[in-house]
Design a protein with these regions (language model features):
Chain B
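ABC-family nucleotide-binding domains
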Residues: 168
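Conserved ABC ATPase signature
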Residues: 133-137, 141
C-alpha cells in the first residue's frame, strides 16, 4: 500500500465515522484526561512547595524531579506491571489489562512533567508576589493560590506538556493495558499494532487524530496566553 | 508611654559579615520614623525582618503586651504590620482587586469591602484606574496603588521601603503628599529612605543605621 493510498484510506476512515477507530480515540482521551486529572493537583502542589521552600535535600528533590522527565515510559510500564500482576503488591486491585491500570500508568508518566514544569514556572516568578501576599495577611494556602495564579501560564504549559507526553506514550499503555480491542486499545498501541499488520490506513488515521489533539491543546494555550495582559477579576 | 512594638536583640549576618546588631528598638504607637543609612547598611533587611519576610535569628518582640518570637512570624504581627516593597508588585487582576487583596485574604465583611476599596482609591487618587491592568501603570501609580492596598487594611505599623526611589517630578510629590496623611490616621510608620523631603517631614523621628548600629536622633 502506497503512502497516497494509505492516506486516502485514513481520511475515508475518519470521515465515515468508523466506530472501532473512534472508540480507540475515546479510550485514549478518557485514560489520558483521567490520568492528568489525578496527577495535576499533587504535582502542582509538590512543584510549588519545592520551588518556594528551602529544606535539606531540596536540590536532590529538584534533581530527581527533572531526572524523572527522562524515565522511559516502558520502564514505568514494567514497574507498574510488576505491581499490578497477580503476585504483585497491588494485584488484588485487578487493574492489569484494564483501563484503570492504563490511567494509573498515565498518572505516573504525567506526574514528573507536571511537577518539573510547575517547579520551573514558580521558581521563575518574582518572589515579591509571595511576599506581597504574606505581607497583606494571606494564609499559606492563599499565598499558594495567589502565586499559582501568577504562574498560571507556566502551569497550563505544564498540563499541556503532560497531556502531550501521556497521550503519545506507547510502552506503558501496551504493557499495562494489553492492547485489548474495544477495551484497552489506545491510539498509540493501535498504531503500533496496525502498522505491524501492514494496515497503514488506520495507523495514519489515528496519527492524524493524535496530531489534531496536540494542535488543539496547544492552540488553547496560545489563545489563553494571548489574553495574558487583560485585567482579570474585577471588583 | 508603652511602645506598640519593642524588638530585642535583633541582628543579621550575611555570611561572616555582621549587617547589624540592634539591642533594642521601640516603636511608639502612632509615631513616624524615617530610617536612613548608606546603601547596603541593612535598611531594607531591617524592615523586611520586622515585616516577617526575612528570617531572623533568636529575637523576641513585645507587641501590645504580648511576648512573641519574630520568627516564625506570629499571626498577631501578620495582621498588624504591613510591608510595602520599594518596587511594589501588582497581582495580574484589576487595580481595585489589588487594593482589595488583603481584605479578601483576611476574610473581612464583604459588604464593607467595596466602600473601603473605593475610599482607599479616592485617598490615593487612583479611582480612574479602577479596572485597569496594573501591568500598564507607571511607577508612581503603582506606588500609590500599593500604599492604598496597605492603608485599606488599617495596619498598626506600616513599613515603607524607599517609596520615592526611582520616582521624580509629580509622581514623587504625589507619593510624598500621601505619607503625612497615613501618619495623621494614627498608624505607626517607618519609612526607609534617602529622600530629603521625607527625612524633613515635620514630627518625624530619625533613625540611622551606621556600622551595624541603630542610632536614634
Amino acid at each position: 500500500m502506497g503512502l497516497l493510498e494509505a492516506t486516502t484510506g485514513a481520511f475515508a476512515l475518519l470521515l465515515r465515522g468508523d466506530a472501532a477507530l473512534w472508540h480507540i480515540v475515546w479510550v485514549s482521551v478518557k485514560t489520558t484526561l483521567s490520568g492528568l486529572i489525578l496527577a495535576t493537583p499533587p504535582a502542582v502542589v509538590l512543584g510549588y512547595l519545592i520551588a518556594m521552600h528551602r529544606f535539606p535535600g531540596r536540590r536532590i528533590a529538584v534533581w530527581l524531579a527533572q531526572a524523572a522527565l527522562s524515565l522511559p515510559t516502558v520502564l514505568i510500564g514494567l514497574l507498574l506491571y510488576l505491581m499490578l500482576s497477580r503476585r504483585g503488591p497491588l494485584g488484588d486491585l485487578g487493574w492489569l489489562f484494564s483501563q484503570p491500570g492504563i490511567i494509573a500508568g498515565q498518572c505516573l508518566i504525567g506526574l514528573p512533567v507536571l511537577l518539573a514544569f510547575t517547579l520551573a514556572a514558580v521558581q521563575a516568578l518574582d518572589p515579591r508576589y509571595a511576599e506581597t501576599a504574606l505581607a497583606h495577611g494571606a494564609s499559606r494556602l492563599r499565598v499558594m493560590f495567589s502565586v499559582l495564579h501568577e504562574a498560571r501560564y507556566g502551569v497550563m504549559a505544564a498540563v499541556i506538556s503532560g497531556f502531550g507526553r501521556v497521550i503519545s506514550e506507547v510502552g506503558c499503555a501496551l504493557m499495562v493495558g494489553g492492547n485489548i480491542e474495544g477495551h484497552t486499545r489506545t491510539i498509540t498501541t493501535a498504531i503500533a499494532l496496525e502498522t505491524s499488520k501492514g494496515d497503514f490506513a488506520q495507523g495514519i488515521a489515528l496519527g492524524i487524530v493524535l496530531v489534531t489533539l496536540a494542535l488543539a491543546m496547544n492552540g488553547v494555550l496560545v489563545l489563553l496566553q494571548g489574553d495574558a495582559h487583560n485585567p482579570g477579576a474585577r471588583l | 508611654m508603652t511602645p506598640l512594638l519593642s524588638v530585642h536583640a535583633l541582628h543579621k549576618r550575611h555570611g561572616e559579615r555582621l549587617l547589624f546588631d540592634i539591642g533594642r528598638l521601640d516603636i511608639a504607637a502612632g509615631a513616624a520614623y524615617v530610617l536612613t543609612g548608606a546603601n547596603g547598611s541593612g535598611k531594607s533587611t531591617l524592615l523586611r525582618m520586622l515585616g516577617g519576610l526575612e528570617r531572623s535569628a533568636a529575637c523576641s518582640v513585645e507587641f501590645d503586651g504580648l511576648h512573641l518570637p519574630l520568627y516564625p512570624y506570629p499571626r498577631p504581627l501578620r495582621h498588624a504590620i504591613v510591608y510595602v516593597h520599594q518596587h511594589p508588585i501588582m497581582f495580574s487582576t484589576s487595580v481595585a482587586h489589588n487594593i482589595a487583596y488583603g481584605l479578601l485574604a483576611r476574610g473581612g465583611d464583604r459588604r464593607l469591602l467595596r466602600s473601603l476599596v473605593d475610599e482607599a482609591m479616592d485617598w490615593a487618587g487612583v479611582t480612574h484606574l479602577r479596572d485597569n491592568d496594573p501591568a500598564r501603570l507607571s511607577g508612581g501609580e503603582k506606588q500609590r496603588v500599593a500604599l492604598a492596598r496597605a492603608r485599606v487594611l488599617q495596619p498598626r505599623l506600616l513599613l515603607l521601603d524607599e517609596p520615592t526611589a526611582n520616582l521624580d517630578g509629580a509622581a514623587r510629590e504625589q507619593v510624598i503628599a500621601l505619607i503625612p496623611t497615613l501618619i495623621d490616621q494614627g498608624a505607626s510608620v517607618i519609612v526607609a529612605c534617602h529622600d530629603r523631603d521625607l527625612i524633613n517631614l515635620p514630627g518625624v523621628q530619625r533613625l540611622k543605621l551606621r556600622d551595624g548600629r541603630l542610632e536614634s536622633r
